């Protein structure tokens, strides 16, 4: 499951209702249980653009709301997530992206 690909294909992962509809479509197509890894990346382009341009977590069109949906989704709680985002030489952007995702996950846990 690649967040940018899904967004670029026109699925709404940002609104709560859109997230539920996206997961329902995925479940109907192949089953949520078959998702074995998630490529977490924001999108430089708008939803439905059919263009795969990754952006740093929280810096694109998916934004924090979309990643809050992902990180608090019970079906994906134990699914590994891989940052597939632009890189800087010092690794600062990856550290920031991981921190943002962890913070969103903690909100579900009440932290």
Regions found by a protein language model. Name each.
Residues 1-56:
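Acidic/histidine-rich catalytic cores of soluble enzymes
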Residues 12-13, 46, 63, 68, ...:
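A generic structural micro-environment signature
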Residues 17-20, 24, 51-68, 90-109:
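Short, electropositive alpha-helical surface patch
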Residues 29-33, 66-79, 104:
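A structural motif corresponding to the C-terminal end of an alpha-helix
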Residues 44, 87-89:
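Residues that cap or initiate secondary-structure elements
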Residues 80-86:
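Short acidic/histidine-rich active-site segments
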């Amino acid at each position: 499951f690649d967040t940018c690909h899904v967004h670029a294909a026109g699925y709404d992962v940002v609104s709560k209702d859109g997230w539920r509809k996206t997961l329902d479509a995925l479940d109907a197509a192949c089953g949520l249980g078959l998702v074995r890894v998630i490529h977490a990346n924001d999108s430089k382009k708008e939803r439905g653009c059919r263009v795969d341009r990754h952006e740093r977590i929280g810096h694109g069109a998916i934004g924090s709301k979309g990643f809050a949906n992902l990180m608090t989704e019970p079906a994906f709680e134990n699914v590994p997530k891989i940052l597939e985002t632009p890189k800087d030489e010092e690794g600062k952007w990856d550290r920031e992206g991981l921190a943002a995702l962890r913070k969103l996950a903690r909100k579900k846990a009440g932290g």
